[in-house]
């Protein structure tokens, strides 16, 4: 059964005029390694900690500024939100299609809230806590191309022609602000697009981004802004002592116009200085140590890296299943070809390397979780290949072969072919990242014994379900298994309204 909304009634939850407060018992374990009678042993002790959560329920008018607004992802997301807001329908060869938010965790998925008369009851994910309605988002952003969003949508060749014709009047007036362009960080083939760039030193470019954010916020009358990078994949930046290893060194390097400070890092610095959440949707190391240091000191949300949309999402499910079933993956070979501008940019070796790292590390935590299958340091052979084939456009092909060892020396091979409509998968993920980033800035918590409420750690692990290479605070384990990531996100939101984690025990029927 499906219900549209619900309200929690509990002595541990209080609904106020502008906030929800919950008193929550967090049950976990602590491990101790000790010696006993001359032998060492592990002791696992159940542990309970009480937390108070406070969530502001006033939903702001939210502005979204996309770096790479005129790209396939930016134009597709903008078009999709307008189509939903205006209730647009259009003819395809199969049927009359209605605008929707399919592919969005927040808008098109559900959560289990209990059972009634022997039937499972589900509610929209977005009903857990008050969220921004995506129809109300205000878009802006930057691009190194000055093409308006209507023409960018046409260039992308993602949406049906009938839909494009209806959207054009809404998008023709949307023109990206000039962006930061550094040909050293992206493929040389992107130079032909670069007719809309910010001139000057790196410090002057960063200051212009700050000015742009302030002017956008003032002109659009939004309460909050979230900035997200959906521009070209950059090459990795060199991390060097004295250059970008600390907050002080990073800012000094910007002042000195050091060449190794990337455009994405400049955008991120500008956002952190303004207290604006910044999310990196590409695989490069935007968040160098000095930037993470800066974000922590300024208590400003940062999240990333790289949208998890197609092949990697499948991989994080399948390998988790195999290892969890006691099956040993020994070889993972992933091949992609695509023909959009992302593929064109990734045809350069230095930018492909960023993507290769992002896609290759996704199974690490699953492998390390099972020392029965893998010895220390052992890892499956893992190869990632990406090729540029212009004809296929945004319709990315992904082919994977998984070879595993099974019972008594047997071998198992799984082969997948996945046609990933690249931007149509990425756009709702961008939407979720923006909405969840904003929501997380309205949540505060304090543990038992703490005097004051505080926000989540600025490095937003809550967004990890949506990213290939989740950014985590120093010393925090990286979790890539998709089911664990979704459970973490859902259970934190459940805690905010005093609901227990969904443990699937269903003891009432046992």
Swiss-Prot record:
- The answer to keyword Lipid biosynthesis applying to this record is yes
Where does it primarily localize? cytoplasm
Q: Which GO terms describe its molecular function?
A: inositol-3-phosphate synthase activity
Q: Which family does it belong to?
A: Belongs to the myo-inositol 1-phosphate synthase family.
Quote additional remarks: Plants silencing RINO1 show a low phytic acid phenotype in seeds, and high accumulation of inorganic phosphate (Pi) in seeds.
Provide the function of this protein.
Answer: Key enzyme in myo-inositol biosynthesis pathway that catalyzes the conversion of glucose 6-phosphate to 1-myo-inositol 1-phosphate in a NAD-dependent manner. Is a key enzyme in the phytic acid biosynthesis pathway in seeds.
Q: What is this protein called?
A: Inositol-3-phosphate synthase 1
Tell me what organism the protein belongs to: Oryza sativa subsp. japonica (Rice)
């Amino acid at each position: 059964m499906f219900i549209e909304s619900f309200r929690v009634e509990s002595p541990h939850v209080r609904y106020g005029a502008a906030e929800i407060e919950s008193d929550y018992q967090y049950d976990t374990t602590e491990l101790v390694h000790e010696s006993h009678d001359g032998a060492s042993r592990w002791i696992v002790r159940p542990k309970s900690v009480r937390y108070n959560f406070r969530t502001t329920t006033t939903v702001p008018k939210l502005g979204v500024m996309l770096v790479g607004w005129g790209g396939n992802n930016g134009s597709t997301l903008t078009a999709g939100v307008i189509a939903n807001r205006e209730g647009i329908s259009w003819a395809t060869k199969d049927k009359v299609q209605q605008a929707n938010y399919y592919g969005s965790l927040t808008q098109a998925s559900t959560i289990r809230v209990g059972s009634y008369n022997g039937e499972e009851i589900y509610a929209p994910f977005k009903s857990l806590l008050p969220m921004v309605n995506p129809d109300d988002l205000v878009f802006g952003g930057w691009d190194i191309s000055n093409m308006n969003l209507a023409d960018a949508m046409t260039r992308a060749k993602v949406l049906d022609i009938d839909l494009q014709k209806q959207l054009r009047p809404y998008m023709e007036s949307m023109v990206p602000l000039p962006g930061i362009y550094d040909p050293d960080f992206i493929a040389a083939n992107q130079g032909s697009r670069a007719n809309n760039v910010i001139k000057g030193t790196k410090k002057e470019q960063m200051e212009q981004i700050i000015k742009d954010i302030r002017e956008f916020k003032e002109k659009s009358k939004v309460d909050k802004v979230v900035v997200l990078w959906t521009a070209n994949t950059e090459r990795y930046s060199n991390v060097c002592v004295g250059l970008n290893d600390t907050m002080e060194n990073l800012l000094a390097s910007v002042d000195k116009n050091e060449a190794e400070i990337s455009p994405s890092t400049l955008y991120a610095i500008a956002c952190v200085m303004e207290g604006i959440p910044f999310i990196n949707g590409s695989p490069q190391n935007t968040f160098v140590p000095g930037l993470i240091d800066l974000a922590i000191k300024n208590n400003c949300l940062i999240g990333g890296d790289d949208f998890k949309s197609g092949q990697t999402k499948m991989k994080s499910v399948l390998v988790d299943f195999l290892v969890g079933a006691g099956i040993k993956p020994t070889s993972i070979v992933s091949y992609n070809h695509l023909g959009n501008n992302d593929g064109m940019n990734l045809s350069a070796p230095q930018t492909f390397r960023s993507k290769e790292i992002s896609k290759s590390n996704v199974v690490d935590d699953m492998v390390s979780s099972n020392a029965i299958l893998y010895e220390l340091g052992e890892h499956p052979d893992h190869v990632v290949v990406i090729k540029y084939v212009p004809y296929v456009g945004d319709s990315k092909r992904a082919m994977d072969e998984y070879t595993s060892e099974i019972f008594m020396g047997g071998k198992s091979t799984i082969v997948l072919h996945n046609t990933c409509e690249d931007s149509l998968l990425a756009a709702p993920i961008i939407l979720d990242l923006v909405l969840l980033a904003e929501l997380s800035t309205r949540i505060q918590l304090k543990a038992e014994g703490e005097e004051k409420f505080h926000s989540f750690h600025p490095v937003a692990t809550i967004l990890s379900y949506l990213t290939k290479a989740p950014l985590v605070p120093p010393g925090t384990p990286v979790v890539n298994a998709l089911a664990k990531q979704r459970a973490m996100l859902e259970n934190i939101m459940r805690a905010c309204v005093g609901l227990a984690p969904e443990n699937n025990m269903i003891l009432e029927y046992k």
